[in-house]
Amino acid sequence: MYKAKISNQSNSDHINDGLKLKNAFITAALKCVPPGDKPEKKELENCFPYFKNEINLLKNIKVIIALGKVAFDACVDFYKKEYNLTKKIKFGHNNVYTLPNNILLVGCYHRSPRNVNTGRINERKMTLLFNKFFKLI
């Protein structure tokens, strides 16, 4: 996010370290760390009301970049429940969909060690994706 000029510093180490985001909000669909980093359906269901409240509080959303399939699926689930979304939406890096309220949903591979080590995602790909979509806001 720093290289795409969305944040004022390259990392955040604690809550009061001065990080500022420009026209961005970061959240997680899953609010806990599940055993083995494999979220179960029940865990996602338990967190859904919090995720839903966050999305509903944000009034000027133009683009949602979902980092990973779990985040992407949570966004799709939200739109199915809140907007009766019926079209088929499939996760993929740089897959873009216009949602019922004209917000763009963008899939992005998660920066997990496996995805980074295999080259599926890297800093350059993330920066290109962020630059492409943050020009819209």
What is each stretch, according to the model?
Residues 1-137:
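A polyanion-binding, active-site-adjacent surface
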